[in-house]
Curated annotation (Swiss-Prot):
The name this protein goes by in its record: PILR alpha-associated neural protein
Single GO MF annotation: protein domain specific binding
Localization per record: Membrane
Annotated signal sequence range: 1-27
Gene behind the chain: Pianp
């Protein structure tokens, strides 16, 4: 019982004990003395000692995304950095293992300064990127520049070499050879079909002219035939028809009634027409 009474009396004193244990806050009256003033960076004579100026690095000001980045200043006599701007975190995610870094596109003949046209691009010392790495500098190389156009031209990457005139490496697809072979075969077959069609057409034009000449010769040698009901007589080309005898002559007025007709006499002697075999 007495312990419970003691705890009930000590509970209100806990805040006072905590305040006495905690250290003083930074915002209290105990402040650090001010730092001494830095000496000005004034360059004196050659014998005067130089003051060491140590400046703290201020945080870079925030730039809006619309403001272009300034060109890096390259000190003459020193090589530019091997990693161009925009590639610090690695090469861009692309399906091509190489990249082309273009320079300014303003000609020097127009009076423009190529180094100040596009401040976001790399200097003229940079060229094409390596096939398996980042861009490599080419300082003072005339072969990387065009004839006054301001474009950076260098050796073509291995992936862009022409197929027929360049080196054939392991990356050539064998299906390309199959496609070329099939295309050549199709062209040859089509040419043969066209030639055969023209030849048959020319032969068909010559045959009717020869057949017409043969028919004309046959018509000139064809004899005349007699189509009478009694019989058929073959007459020559210049043969004369047989003259009928008085017994076989039929009177002009027709057969008289009561007069017998001669036996074997044809009923129609005048119905003779030429027969032509077509």
């Amino acid at each position: 019982m007495w312990s419970a009474q003691l705890l009930s009396q000590l509970l209100p004193l806990w805040p006072l004990l905590l305040l006495s244990v905690l250290p003083p806050a930074q915002g209290s009256s105990h402040r650090s003395p001010p730092a001494p003033a830095r000496p000005p960076c004034v360059r004196g004579g050659p014998s005067a000692p130089r003051h060491v100026c140590v400046w703290e690095r201020a945080p870079p000001p925030s730039r809006s995304p619309r403001v272009p980045r300034s060109r890096r200043q390259v000190v003459p006599g020193t090589a530019p950095p091997a990693t161009p701007s925009g590639f610090e975190e690695g090469p861009p995610s692309s399906q091509y293992p190489w990249a082309i870094v273009w320079g300014p596109t303003v000609s020097r003949e127009d009076g423009g300064d190529p180094n100040s046209v596009n401040p976001g691009f790399l200097p003229l010392d940079y060229g094409f990127a390596a096939p398996h790495g980042l861009a490599t500098p080419h300082p003072n190389s005339d072969s990387m520049r065009d004839d006054g156009d301001g474009l950076i031209l260098g050796e073509t990457p291995a992936t862009l070499r022409p197929f027929l005139f360049g080196g054939r490496g392991e990356g050539v697809d064998p299906q390309l050879y199959v496609t070329i072979t099939i295309s050549i075969i199709i062209v040859l077959v089509a040419t043969g079909i066209i030639f055969k069609f023209c030849w048959d057409r020319s032969q068909k034009r010559r045959r009717p002219s020869g057949q017409q000449g043969a028919l004309r010769q046959e018509e000139s040698q064809q004899p005349l035939t007699d189509l009478s009901p009694a019989g058929v007589t073959v007459l020559g080309a210049f043969g004369d028809s047989p003259t009928p005898t008085p017994d076989h002559e039929e009177p002009r007025g027709g057969p008289r009634p009561g007069m017998p007709q001669p036996k074997g006499a044809p009923a129609f002697q005048l119905n003779r027409i030429p027969l032509v075999n077509l």
